[in-house]
Amino acid sequence: MSAVKIESPRGQTWSKVEEIRLFKWMMLFKPAGIHKHFHMVCLLERLNKPDQYPIKLLQSDKGSSDKVFSGEDVWEQLSRYYNLEKADEVENQPYPEFYNDDGPTETTNKKTEGDAQLDNDDDSDNDVDNCDELKRNIIPLQNRLQQETEFELSWEDYGELMLEHARDHEVEDIKQEETASADDKAKLKGAESQDTQVEQESEEPREREKDIDEKDTEQNNVQAKQEMATTPPVSVGESVSELANEPVDEPVDAHKKPRTRRSTRLTRSQKRGIDDESENKEDQPHGGNTDEKEDVEHDTEGRSGSEKESTADAADTTATKQVTFADESEGAAKESANSPTGKAEENETESSQQPRPKKQKVAAAEEVPEDLADVDSPARRTRRKSITKPTTRLSSRLRSRK
């Protein structure tokens, strides 16, 4: 609690700052009229507490905060500038009638229902009439104070101030527009950056998947090339057995013709050709059989080289034919050597000096390697007949003569 300040006696001196504070608060709380005592209480509270109710002053003077003012000090100071009795009369006067340019207001001419009842009553007093007059006069004044009015300032006195005020408003408007445009641009950039980020995030997994697929395909191609390079050459018999047991999965090209799997079984025409060749070999001498073996081995070696270049299906068919031809020729040679009729037939064949059908067949096969790939083709059949059938006819005629 702060120490209680001693009230000053009458005739207290007032500084400039204290007088300014007095008139400042007197504008809000007039110590005159009916409510002058209530207004004086509020005015003394603000004068004695400058820290709680400060006032901005042009000069740097500060009043002493040790002073305590009373109501008598304030009345004495105000009596130097105003006539307090006249001030009370003016403050207590009723509001005068308010007239517009066109005449008295509507409120002065019209009467409310309550006013009509008061006028009609014979027992109405003068006090009631005075109250009605006060109401009629106060209402238009309140309306007048609440209305907005236009006014003009003289250009000579306030022209420069008005120009500066207008320029300041223009500058502020321009700044506000610039800031608004900058904010809009920043928002647009932020939205665009967010969209680009979302697109990049969505594209990244796709690119990763593409890269992974490309890497997998490259690795598969490299592995396939390495396997092709590292696989050793396989003999004809092994390749035939492997191809017969295991199906080969080859990549299908759109430009190449679709391959059809060839069967390894012998057709009737092939079986007839084999029987005819075996009969011809039985007619030949024993000495020529070894030459035929050598020729067959030589022919098989030549055929194996050409068969490697041809397709896998052609290799299957040709290998089986060569093996069967060699086996049957060896069996026929042994039988002809043991039988007595075979020796006679060998002598006849030596005298006749017939051409070797096997060599002709091998030469024809070497000249036309494409027929090996397609055993059942009509061209292959016609050539086989042209090579083998004449020899078979000669052998059958010789047998008939014997």
Curated annotation (Swiss-Prot):
UniProt biased composition (Acidic residues): 116-128
Ranges of Basic residues composition bias in the record: 256-271
Biased composition (Basic and acidic residues): 172-192, 203-213, 281-311
Keyword Nucleus on entry: yes
Ranges annotated as biased composition (Polar residues): 219-233
Pfam families per record: Eaf7
Location in the cell: Nucleus
GO BP annotations, alphabetical order: chromatin organization; DNA repair; regulation of transcription by RNA polymerase II
GO CC term, one of those recorded: nucleus
Subunit structure: Component of the NuA4 histone acetyltransferase complex.
Family: Belongs to the EAF7 family.
Protein name listed in UniProt: Chromatin modification-related protein EAF7
Species of provenance: Kluyveromyces lactis (strain ATCC 8585 / CBS 2359 / DSM 70799 / NBRC 1267 / NRRL Y-1140 / WM37) (Yeast)
